[in-house]
């Protein structure tokens, strides 16, 4: 054995240093790691729009949906792609985030929809790039404020029945259209505000001269009349302020509010003037107090939506206005200093100091140019021209931002008012539908008023249509949907008074026990032939509808003691014929029952696979004339010829 080892050992050593191979065949390659995933292209289908990217691109962020294994739940084995039923426009920004690592906010997208998409993909909005983050935060804040206002208005409407006296009074002050008394008080205060402002202006107009003195203003010549007007206005303003203070939810916040301060400043000069004497030492202070009466004009902001929107605009543009003020201050100081030293050598110069040059700089930068101070030297004229041009640039920059904010806030308020009006109209229509009877439903069915998406705008025609269109229509349509979904059968409309015989197809019958006995009794009182209703037609083995309610003819029931209104409603009552589902190509569904019937269809009654079931419309309320005059249901007589029903009965609740 030692000899054998000695024989091949030199060859192994020679092969180790590369002199000769150990074997004639090459050695096999090292086994590859099969678990190592190769990079590949994957397809992301977002609502039909296909996106392609590398798998490693998505795996950069494993904490998100697309970067984790959770995306495998959305993999489609048939198409070999990931399908997401989401917004494809927002997904472009999401995919660019995986590619570049920067998340951007598209300004044309709704902020709520954008947040929902980011939450779905597991991306935090805090990583939005600096170029879009300010815009995103502004839109987020505006949307939150708008939603807060909508929620407050909805809460006020929902909690209306349980409001206290103070809450009712505060609601009347904030929304004068809630009651007639609040609306009257609203217009009365607005009238006295206008009278107060006009009085403050007219009392300074000269009203003739007095012998031996100069012209007297109207306020001094007719002092008693103006004092009475001022007293009446101040009394109204005082009562309004005290009532608002009493009804305010938080009196501390109300006192600190801007409008409360304006109210106090508007009425305090009158009371201070009553206690002040005509001493010359205090006459200057009295004149100063009378100047504050002009602030009463700001009380119009409660009566003007445009003024309130302007205030909101200035508040939202506080940063832009601060930038404008800071820029103007810097420019005024710089150009005032330059103009002072440029005009210092001129003997007739009016630029005596830098603060005196402020006036020229302000007037020049605002492009007013009164001409009371003008430069005399060439250097002063050059710097004055530069000051005028720079003022145009500095002032013009923030103006488009302020205008755009005003337009945006104005349109938001307009849309909010429109939504509140539409919601109020829908609630009123539902309230009318709840108090309506079955005749209103049948009347709307007969006239084809089935447009539930109608929005009321205040016209008399639309108001009448809103009253006749009730909620029962949508409930009836939904019930028929559920019946077809449960049984797999098609439903056809027919007249119950022309055919009340029952036959079984698949042991299904839908019947309302509330009116079954009375319908049987009424059908036994008639002597109609036992033929099928002419409201059914057959075409190629399929059954379609031909609603007989479209005809205007009224059929009077013989030997019936029921009122005429009840007979008409019973003639308009519908039954539902059920056809077996052996034929898979049925073209009639429950959704067509609430549509207008095709008047061009020819009635044909040669079908045998029909069974009759009755679904009754709710009986009129006891408060209606029909409910009062309708007799109680009687048991069927002995002559009632109705075959026994051996099928299962499915009881349908009354709509």
UniProtKB/Swiss-Prot annotation:
Localization per record: Cell membrane; Cell membrane, Sarcolemma; Cell projection, Dendrite
Region (Disordered): which ranges?
523-565, 616-647
A Pfam family the protein falls into: Ion_trans
Q: Summarize where Zn(2+) binds, as residue positions.
A: 104, 110, 131-132
Motif Selectivity filter: residue span? 367-372
Its tissue distribution reads: Highly expressed in brain, in particular in the retrosplenial cortex, medial habenula, anterior thalamus, hippocampus, cerebellum and lateral geniculate and superior colliculus. Highly expressed in heart atrium (at protein level) and throughout the ventricle wall, in lung and vas deferens.
Q: Its function?
A: Pore-forming (alpha) subunit of voltage-gated A-type potassium channels that mediates transmembrane potassium transport in excitable membranes, in brain and heart. In cardiomyocytes, may generate the transient outward potassium current I(To). In neurons, may conduct the transient subthreshold somatodendritic A-type potassium current (ISA). Kinetics properties are characterized by fast activation at subthreshold membrane potentials, rapid inactivation, and quick recovery from inactivation. Channel properties are modulated by interactions with regulatory subunits.
Full protein name: A-type voltage-gated potassium channel KCND3
């Amino acid at each position: 054995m030692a000899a054998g080892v000695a024989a091949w050992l030199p060859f192994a050593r020679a092969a180790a240093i590369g002199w000769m191979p150990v074997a004639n065949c090459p050695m096999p390659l090292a086994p590859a790691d099969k678990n190592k995933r190769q990079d590949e292209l994957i397809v992301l289908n977002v609502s039909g729009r296909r996106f392609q990217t590398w798998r490693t691109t998505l795996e950069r962020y494993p904490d998100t949906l697309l970067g984790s294994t959770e995306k495998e739940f959305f993999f489609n084995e048939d198409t070999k792609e990931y399908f997401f039923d989401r917004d494809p426009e927002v997904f472009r920004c999401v995919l660019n985030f995986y590619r570049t690592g920067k998340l951007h906010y598209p300004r044309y997208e709704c902020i709520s929809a954008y947040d929902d998409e980011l939450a779905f993909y597991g991306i935090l909005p805090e990583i939005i790039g600096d170029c879009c983050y300010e815009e995103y935060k502004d839109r987020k804040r505006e949307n939150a404020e708008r939603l807060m206002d909508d929620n407050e208005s909805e809460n006020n409407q929902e909690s209306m029945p349980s409001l206290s006296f103070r809450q009712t009074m505060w609601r009347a002050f904030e929304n004068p259209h809630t009651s007639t008394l609040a609306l009257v008080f609203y217009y009365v205060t607005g009238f006295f505000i206008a009278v107060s402002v006009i009085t403050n202006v007219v009392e300074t107009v000269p009203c003739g001269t007095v012998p031996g003195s100069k012209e007297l203003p109207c306020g001094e010549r007719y002092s008693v009349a103006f004092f009475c007007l001022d007293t009446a206005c101040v009394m109204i303003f005082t009562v309004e302020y005290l009532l608002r203070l009493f009804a305010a939810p938080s009196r501390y916040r109300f006192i600190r509010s801007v409008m409360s301060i304006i109210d106090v400043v508007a009425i305090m000069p009158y009371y201070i003037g009553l206690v002040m004497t005509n001493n010359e030492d205090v006459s200057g202070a009295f004149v100063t107090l009378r100047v504050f009466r002009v602030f009463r004009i700001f009380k119009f902001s409660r009566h003007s939506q445009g003024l309130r929107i302007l205030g909101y605009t200035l508040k939202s543009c506080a940063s832009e206005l601060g930038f404008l003020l800071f820029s103007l201050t810097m420019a005024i100081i710089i150009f005032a200093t330059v103009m002072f030293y440029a005009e210092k050598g001129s003997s007739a110069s009016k630029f005596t100091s830098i603060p005196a040059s402020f006036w020229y700089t302000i007037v020049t930068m605002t492009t007013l140019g009164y001409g009371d101070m003008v430069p005399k030297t060439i250097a002063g004229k050059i710097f004055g021209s530069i000051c005028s041009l720079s003022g145009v640039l500095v002032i013009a920059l923030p103006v488009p931002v302020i205008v755009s904010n005003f337009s945006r806030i104005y349109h938001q308020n307009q849309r909010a008012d429109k939504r509140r009006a539409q919601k109020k109209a829908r609630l009123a229509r539902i309230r009318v539908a709840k108090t309506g009877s079955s005749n209103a439903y049948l009347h709307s069915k007969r006239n084809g008023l089935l447009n539930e998406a109608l929005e009321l705008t205040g016209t008399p025609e639309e108001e009448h249509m809103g009253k006749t269109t009730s909620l029962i229509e949508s409930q009836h349509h939904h019930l028929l949907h559920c019946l077809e979904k449960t049984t797999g059968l098609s439903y056809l409309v027919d007249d119950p008074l022309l055919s009340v015989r029952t036959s079984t197809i698949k042991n299904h019958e839908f019947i309302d026990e509330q009116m079954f006995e009375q319908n049987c009794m009424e059908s036994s009182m008639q002597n109609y032939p036992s033929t099928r209703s002419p409201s059914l037609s057959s075409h190629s083995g399929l059954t379609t509808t031909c609603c007989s309610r479209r005809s205007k003819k009224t059929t009077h029931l013989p030997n019936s003691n029921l009122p005429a209104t009840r007979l008409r409603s019973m003639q308009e009552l519908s039954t539902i014929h059920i056809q077996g589902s052996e034929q898979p190509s049925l073209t009639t569904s429950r959704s067509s029952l609430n549509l207008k019937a095709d008047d061009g269809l020819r009635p044909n009654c040669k079908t045998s696979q029909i069974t009759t079931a009755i679904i009754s419309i709710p009986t009129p309320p006891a408060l209606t004339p029909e409910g009062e005059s309708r007799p109680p249901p009687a048991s069927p007589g002995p002559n009632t010829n109705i075959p026994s029903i051996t099928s299962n009965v499915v009881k349908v609740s009354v709509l």
